[in-house]
Amino acid sequence: MESQRNLLLLALLFVSFLLYTAWVEEKTPQVAPQVQTEQVDSSVPASVASSANSANLSDGVPNSPQQSSTDATSTELPASQSVTIANDELRLTISLVGGDIIKADLLQHDATLDSDTPYRLLDSGNGFTYIAQSGLIGQGPDANKNGRPLYDTTDTESVLADGQAEVSTMLHFVDADGNIFIKTFTLKRGEYVTNVAYQIENKTDSPLNVQLYAQLRETLSDDSGSMVMPVYRGGAFSTTETRYEKYSFSDMQDGPLQKTTEGGWVAMLQHYFVSAWIPSPTDQNVLYSNIIQDKEAAIGFKAPSKTIAPQSVAELETNLWVGPKIQEEMALVAKNLDLTVDYGWLWFIAQPLFKLLLFFQGIVGNWGVAIILITFTVKGALYPLTKAQYTSMAKMRLLQPKIKELREQFGEDRQKVSKAMMELYKKEKVNPLGGCFPILLQMPIFIALYWSLMESVELRHAPFMLWIQDLSVQDPYYILPILMGVSMFFIQKMSPTTVQDPMQQKVMQFMPVIFTFFFLWFPAGLVLYWLMSNVVTLIQQTLIYRSFEKKGLHQKEKEPVVLTKK
């Protein structure tokens, strides 16, 4: 029950946590291209290509995002077949074929640290696809068996000007019956939301039935990060019954998503960033997923069908979030969208810790200093538990001579030894597990803080000081992990022990080295937290032991006396 044994327990719990995380990633089937037994022409709608599964809710949604009746083979559009729209947060490239968003640059987020290139979340080309597709099926232009509609526009580039609140770009298409379809994209200042609106003018003498759909398409990927930095890349959705649930690429391969819900949303997630289609919260929407030619995964929604009377005009719209996982902003855009910042099963601890971290950062303006302040706060709040832990261990050490006498008295009779020890603990008012409970209670807090730092896009490219210019990646010179290992070594040296087993002694001696090795690849922000936690532990340990010395509960370790023969 000594301090070093508790340190070993903490280490084992932490390593077990990492191994469990790695096991979860390993047990999740990795996505690999499957052998195609039949080549499906990309020009046919999904309803034809997936005829083997007539219940698939993605029926009617086109498979090919780029294809039009005028250009059925191109995957890289010339500049004349795309337009751009930008506000102060986003720059979108929109294909005139179907009006899909084929590129999205996040202007406030660098691709790499201190680069002049913005982070590109959506992209198309070079063998990779991650796009936001939307259209009108039923009797709409996107259901044409000859391909997607080729829109016309007078706006080649629309940029939010100074003093403007929003910027829009309009695409026009007229079908063979003379029906007019206007697709408008609108960006507001300071927002990551794109409003996609349709104006449909029925020029015929017959009713026109159309159905709005929107989906996110991404090349199948097995990028799951590393053991210490596990990340999720795949789909997710929300319904009235399920607030938030991941739907991975392997889930989509096992079977399509099929949900009907009021409102809801569908999304594609990756580390720090998310794209999500958000339909009308009052419509009964169909959420679906699809695997396209064993190469791409799609997750999307279909709104209810709408009938437009002859010689009438109707409007439909949806919203698209393309941006970082900023909880406060996402919560305002759609219900439960902020849950894409996934803190795991300890979210109820991680959420307030993150809010506290935000509070400190708002005061000091430095995320590294905010981590130090939250460390002081957490360790201060846990000080009563820490003191109780050391008090229990000190009392256990004082009982060691009596426990030794009991073992000598009863010999190999373990039952009598255990009974006598329980009576001794009761008499001396000592809980033999008192040194373990506090450390077990502290571990969930560390894990919760681990996930809150891991999931926080705010720490991406956030500097601390000196050589630490990005708290979301490892220390480039490994200085923090080494200092953390040194601090663990001093904690060991200050902790009295009665461990006699040579194997346990060797394990304890190597724990600082093992932890240092693990932390070499940890984000600098996490290592900073652990280092400062150890520093505070050393201070608390010193103060507690001094108070124990006055009460006779602690004595400084003496060097062993070595007897030599003369």
UniProtKB/Swiss-Prot annotation:
| Keywords noted in UniProt | Cell inner membrane, Cell membrane, Chaperone, Membrane, Protein transport, Transmembrane, Transmembrane helix, Transport
* One GO cellular component term noted in the UniProt record for this chain: plasma membrane
The UniProt regions of compositional bias labelled Polar residues, in chain numbering, are 31-41, 61-80
Low complexity bias: where?
42-58
Its membrane topology: Multi-pass membrane protein
Q: Look up the record and give one Gene Ontology term from the biological process aspect.
A: protein insertion into membrane
**Ubl conjugation as a keyword?**
no
Source superkingdom: Bacteria
InterPro entries cross-referenced by the UniProt entry? Membr_insert_YidC, Membr_insert_YidC_N, YidC/ALB3/OXA1/COX18, YidC/Oxa/ALB_C, YidC_ALB_C, YidC_periplasmic_sf
Q: Where in the cell is it found?
A: Cell inner membrane
Region span, Disordered: 30-80
TM spans (from-to) = 6-26, 356-376, 433-453, 471-491, 510-530
- GO MF terms on file? membrane insertase activity
Answer whether the UniProt record assigns the keyword Protein transport to this protein: yes
Subunit relationships: Interacts with the Sec translocase complex via SecD. Specifically interacts with transmembrane segments of nascent integral membrane proteins during membrane integration.
What does the function comment of this entry state?
Required for the insertion and/or proper folding and/or complex formation of integral membrane proteins into the membrane. Involved in integration of membrane proteins that insert both dependently and independently of the Sec translocase complex, as well as at least some lipoproteins. Aids folding of multispanning membrane proteins.
Similarity comment: family membership: Belongs to the OXA1/ALB3/YidC family. Type 1 subfamily.
Annotated HAMAP family:
YidC_type1 (MF_01810)
The name under which this protein is listed is Membrane protein insertase YidC
